[in-house]
Amino acid sequence: EREGAEPAEVAEPAEAEAVAGEKLLTRIAVIGMGRLGGAENGFGSDADVMFVHEPLDGADEDAAQEQAARIVNRTLALLKQPVKPAIRAERPLEVDADLRPEGKQGAIVRSLDSYRSYYERWAETWEFQALTRARPIAGDEALGEAFVELIDPYRYPATFTPEQVQQIRRMKARVENERMPHGADRTRQLKLGRGGLSDVEWLVQLVQLRHAHAVPGLRTTSTLKALDAAVEAGLVDAADAEILSGAWLLATKIRGGNVLRGVRQSDTLPSGRADLEAIARWCGYPAGSARALEEDYLRQTRNARKVYERLFFEEL
């Protein structure tokens, strides 16, 4: 379910263009974040990424930083171009690097030492939560592994304080209130709605932040694998996990179907009969199942929301 070129396919030509006629000063790794990091991206998904570089031995650090920025910016430009040969109805690949330190105001690429300094001194709790999805996807493999070694103590901390738990809970409430489209029906919002993707993912990530240090199975960027590990460790009841995973999978499938059908609001369960029928068939329902899909989604997410509210606010 890919759109456009993968980072690994454009990194080398981007590097060649950016350093033409000059000595290579640094090595670079691309870190997948969000759904890309979790290997869960589908039709229409953004590609959330961060970039890390490491100057080569003897290279001037400032010159290496400047060169790394040129390579990264050229890579981003190439990734946004249509693939060749052209694909009918291709959607432009949206590459989002806003999860990097300091967001849009921060450097597009940082050295390993710069990341270390930031996470030690200035990072907020939600940034450690975002790192639960961080996974090297392209570039220098050894550097990618070094980045993982750097971030593991922050995303899988030995101690996750009650205050940090409260910070995550407050941030979740803020995201729900600020990012929900004005006037939207919360029961039909696939991503931010009640029992939707966000509820399941935030709950799983909170479990990881609190317990992954002691439970190796939770050290995964995959939502469903982490949920399975939580069940195995006795942190989440199997019946609750089944409800959560069922709602997450159905919301994911509907979202992909919306994109393929060209539904204008791809993060919303359609209300029109024709759209619902088409999405139902995409989800594997027999013909004439528009109402069944709607009822199933509303029921499953209603149950998932109950599980989320109980577990997200209790002392797991």
Which stretches of residues belong to each language-model region?
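A nucleotide- and high-energy phosphate-metabolite-utilizing enzyme signature
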Residues: 1-316
